[in-house]
Structure formats: structure tokens, C-alpha cells
């Protein structure tokens, strides 16, 4: 979350904080005095006694039972709440890392208390925990910040006080000390949570570490915050479904936290660090996301009224790049129902001047959360087209929304009038998750749609467009660039991301033909 959390609110996840007095960090910047970040949450989030802390981690690791991953682990995610709450989940990440010989850890974390608008790479010499000091790889840090103006050497987000006991980096360190032994640390706290900042960090890390096999990139993040148990599970599984589908672009634009009891679309306080880690991992050859363990604080305490979600995840380089996104299909009846809903939604908003409220759908497919576009045509010509690229609402609600918006909010056209309603033809495109294109030769005209993004410029073309226009792959790429308001050769720019997707596309004529064929 790109906000400074209220320290009192965080007591839900770590009630022991209310009983503790924190000492401000000691720092003497004069002369050659090392700049060492002292432990701020030892004794609250985890034991301050080294022996007790070591024994607790050993016990949690021993209980983290699961098959050992054989593929190379390129990056990972671990939660950062108090060990009594998130430790049983975090242990699953660290159990997989045990025995690996990483000499450097790049630890990417969110800020909970201090607001700033850049990515803060720690400018000090060490972090300290009850298990000892962890030295900073200062040369790596200096190289990294030179890669992008979004990054700075700074102690913003790293320093802690009694009023702002930042913990998102610190909580991970005793785990790393136990499972890796000696290593150098590059601690990073992200104040700017935009996709551009996550991309800049992920790409920069991949460039520096291109031939490095001894560095671990770790994202520090919890999931949803302070919702009733059942709501939290639903929100968290949306996030984890997108993670496993490798749709980090949709994750980045849909992470949000509105406040206690107000569910966001997807939630993770370390959403930007997760996205940065995925972008890095992808460019290093990772092609699968594995969720090792999910739970929330209610599973530990038994209090289901307001919980915090946790997951342990790794990004691996597997022989097969197959994601867990299941094939999606619709029956003729479901397609017909969606088209009827689109027409009803447009007619209702044009005639009544407010959105149609459809009855709940009994179809499991129509209740799946899916991205979709609704296209309106009149006499064969485009009359409006708007959609959601991300799976943020049940499909039938997405169709209601996008049909309504296509008729009333498409900036290329005036609003649909009542006299046009009988002339409109409807087409719906139900989208798969987005996946970045690493080789344009893999783009299949008629199968893939494209989304092109470079900075603030962004444009999308559906899979049916190049077929209708009789374009080849090269022209399809150029036209998507132009749709984004960029040069026609923007797709060759290393700063341009190309995302592809597939779609289930159907119009009223298609459904009538399909229905006739089944008789």
C-alpha cells in the first residue's frame, strides 16, 4: 500500500506492540562511524533472546512439511507479521531455501509508516538482529541506483523509531540468517508502488544479475488486512490466482487497500515488491509461480472477525511454462444469456438513464471473475468498445458494466441514442490473464490479443481485430503501437512491454449459428 499505516491499526496483527517501549536507533554519522540499522521489533514480532529466536525458527521450519522443489528458485515471497502469526507460513518459503548457497539477498519490502515517492535502497553498512549483523553490499547498491531515476540511496523506509517501528525488512532477516548463514544484504523499501517503479527495479536487477546464480531476490508482503475471515480468503485467493497465472500487470494496477472492513479488489501491502520480484524472475527465466502455503491470522488465533492473510510463494524456472490458469469455455446458452444481458444493459441505460441491475446468475461460469470487452457495431461499423483487462468482477457483472460503458462512455463516439438501439449488434470477448511476450514470433494472429505499454502510453487490440483487417503479425504489432499513441515501431523498444492474451469471442450471429448446429 502506498500509504503510511496507522501504528495503532497494526496492533491487530501484533498486539504485543502495545506493551513495548522502542528505543530510537543509535546512529552517529560523524567520521567513519558505521551506519547500522538496529533491530526495532525484536521482543515483539519475534524473540529478542538469540537462543529462543533460533529455537523458534528451527521449530517452525521442522513443521513446514512439503515436497522439496527441485527446479531453480529465482525469487520468493514471505510474509512479515509477528512470527506467532505469519511464522507458520513464512517457514514454507524458508524451508525451500535451506541449504542453498546464496551469497547475496536482495530484499524488497513496502513502507508501512513513512511516505515517500521513490524506491529506497539502504545507504548504510549493516542491519542488526539478535542473531548478529548482516552486512550491506554497498557496491551493488550503488550500481543499482544508477540504473533508474526511480531509485535512490537513502534510509527512508529503513530507519525505525518508537512511533514508527518499520519491520518489513527486519522480520525476514533472522530467517535468512538461519537458513543461509553468511550473506550480504541489499535492503530495498518501495515508497512508489506504481507499475513503472516495480518494472524499473525488476528490469534493473535482471540486467545486473544476468549471469549471477548466487543471488536471491525476496519480496516481503502480507496479503489482505482486517477483513472477516471468509472475505479475506476470497480476496487472497484472487491475488494468488493472478500470481499463479503470472499476470503481474493486472496485479499491479489492481492492488489496493481501502481500509478495515472495506475490501479492495486484490490486496497485498507488499504488492509492488511482489510485482518487482516477478518482473525480475521472468527476465531471469522463471516461468512458474508456486504457492507453497496460505493461511491467515484467524487460523492461528481462532478470531475470525478481522484477519491478516499470508502466503509463501516461489518463482521457479520449470521445464514447462504452463500456468495454472484453467481453460475457459461457455455453453451456447451462457453465451446467449451474456449477449442478452449486454443488450438489456445498453437499452436500459439509454432509456432509463441509470445502470441495469441484473438478477444474480446461477451459472458457475458466469460467476467466475473474468476480464471482458463488449463491442457494439452498427451497420458493420464500430459504435463502441470498452472492457476490463483484469478479472475484477463476476463475468456477468463485467458484461453489464462494459456494455453500459461502451454505449455511454467510449470517448471516440457520442452516446448511443434510443433510435439506434434496434440497429446495434453485440459482440463479447472474454479474456484470459495477460502474459508478457518474450518472443514476438510466438504471437499468433487470430489467437492472441495484444496490450502495448510504455510509461503512460498504453493500447490494446482484441484478437479478432487483425483478422477483420487482414493484418499480418508485423502490422498487428505496429497497429497496437499506434493504438497506444506511440510510434509504429515502439514494439522494438526495450522499454515497451508487450502483453498477450487469448479470448472467447462470440457475437449474436455466432451464437445463432452455433445453436442451429446443435439441433
Stretch-by-stretch model annotation:
Residues 1-5:
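N-terminal secretory signal peptides that target proteins for export/translocation
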Residues 7-8, 12-34:
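Bacterial Sec-dependent signal peptides at the C-terminal "C-region" and cleavage site
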Residues 32-279, 283-285, 294-301:
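Active-site histidine-anchored catalytic micro-motif
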Residues 73-74, 170-173, 310, 369-374:
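Short glycine-rich loop/turn motifs
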Residues 175, 187, 310-312, 498-500:
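Conserved hydrophobic/aromatic beta-strand scaffold that supports enzyme active sites
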Residues 180-184, 279-290, 321, 353, ...:
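Short helix-capping/linker segments at secondary-structure and domain boundaries
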Residues 286, 291-324:
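Long, Lys/Arg- and hydrophobic-enriched amphipathic alpha-helices
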Residues 322-519:
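Basic nucleic-acid-binding interfaces
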Amino acid at each position: 500500500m502506498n500509504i503510511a499505516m496507522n501504528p495503532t491499526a497494526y496492533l491487530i496483527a501484533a498486539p504485543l506492540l502495545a506493551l513495548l517501549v522502542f528505543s530510537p536507533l543509535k546512529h552517529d554519522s560523524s567520521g567513519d562511524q558505521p551506519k547500522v540499522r538496529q533491530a526495532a521489533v525484536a521482543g515483539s514480532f519475534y524473540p529478542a533472546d538469540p537462543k529462543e529466536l533460533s529455537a523458534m525458527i528451527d521449530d517452525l521450519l521442522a513443521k513446514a512439511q512439503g515436497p522439496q522443489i527441485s527446479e531453480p528458485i529465482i525469487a520468493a515471497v514471505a510474509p512479515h507479521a509477528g512470527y506467532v502469526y505469519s511464522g507458520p507460513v513464512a517457514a514454507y518459503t524458508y524451508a525451500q531455501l535451506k541449504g542453498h548457497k546464496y551469497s547475496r539477498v536482495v530484499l524488497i519490502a513496502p513502507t508501512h509508516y513513512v511516505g515517500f515517492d521513490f524506491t529506497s535502497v539502504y545507504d548504510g553498512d549493516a542491519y542488526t538482529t539478535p542473531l548478529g549483523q548482516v552486512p550491506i553490499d554497498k557496491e551493488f547498491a550503488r550500481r543499482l541506483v544508477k540504473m533508474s531515476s526511480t531509485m535512490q540511496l537513502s534510509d527512508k523506509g529503513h530507519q525505525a523509531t518508537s512511533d514508527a517501528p518499520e519491520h518489513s525488512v527486519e522480520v525476514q532477516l533472522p530467517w535468512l540468517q538461519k537458513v543461509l548463514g553468511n550473506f550480504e544484504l541489499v535492503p530495498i523499501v518501495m515508497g512508489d508502488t506504481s507499475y513503472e517503479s516495480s518494472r524499473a527495479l525488476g528490469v534493473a536487477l535482471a540486467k545486473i544479475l544476468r549471469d549471477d546464480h548466487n543471488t536471491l531476490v525476496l519480496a516481503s508482503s502480507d496479503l489482505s488486512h482486517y477483513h472477516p475471515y471468509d472475505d479475506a480468503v476470497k480476496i487472497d485467493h484472487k491475488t494468488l490466482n493472478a500470481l499463479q497465472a503470472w499476470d503481474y500487470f493486472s496485479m499491479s494496477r489492481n492492488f489496493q487497500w481501502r481500509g478495515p472492513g472495506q475490501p479492495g479488489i486484490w490486496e497485498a501491502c507488499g504488492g509492488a515488491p511482489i510485482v518487482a520480484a516477478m518482473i525480475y524472475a521472468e527476465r531471469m527465466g522463471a516461468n512458474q509461480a508456486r504457492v507453497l502455503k496460505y493461511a491467515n491470522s484467524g487460523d492461528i488465533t481462532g478470531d475470525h472477525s478481522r484477519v491478516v492473510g499470508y502466503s509463501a510463494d516461489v518463482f521457479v524456472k520449470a521445464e514447462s511454462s504452463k500456468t495454472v490458469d484453467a481453460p475457459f469455455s461457455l455453453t451456447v446458452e451462457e453465451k446467449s444469456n451474456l449477449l442478452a444481458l449486454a443488450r438489456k444493459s445498453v437499452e436500459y441505460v439509454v432509456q432509463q438513464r441509470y445502470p441495469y441491475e441484473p438478477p444474480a446468475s446461477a451459472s458457475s461460469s458466469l460467476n467466475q471473475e473474468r476480464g471482458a470487452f463488449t463491442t457494439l457495431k452498427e451497420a458493420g461499423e464500430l459504435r463502441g468498445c470498452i472492457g476490463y483487462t483484469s478479472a475484477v468482477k463476476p463475468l456477468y457483472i463485467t458484461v453489464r458494466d462494459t456494455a453500459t460503458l461502451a454505449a455511454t462512455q467510449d470517448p471516440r463516439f457520442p452516446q448511443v441514442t434510443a433510435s439506434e438501439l434496434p440497429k446495434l449488434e453485440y459482440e463479447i470477448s472474454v479474456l484470459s490473464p495477460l502474459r508478457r511476450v518474450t518472443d514476438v514470433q510466438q504471437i499468433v494472429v487470430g489467437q492472441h490479443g495484444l496490450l502495448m505499454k510504455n510509461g503512460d502510453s498504453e493500447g490494446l487490440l482484441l484478437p479478432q481485430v487483425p483478422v477483420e483487417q487482414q493484418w499480418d503479425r508485423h502490422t498487428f504489432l505496429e497497429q497496437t503501437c499506434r493504438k497506444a499513441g506511440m510510434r509504429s515501431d515502439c514494439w522494438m523498444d526495450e522499454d515497451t512491454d508487450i502483453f498477450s492474451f487469448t479470448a472467447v469471442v462470440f457475437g449474436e450471429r455466432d451464437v445463432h449459428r452455433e445453436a442451429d448446429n446443435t439441433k
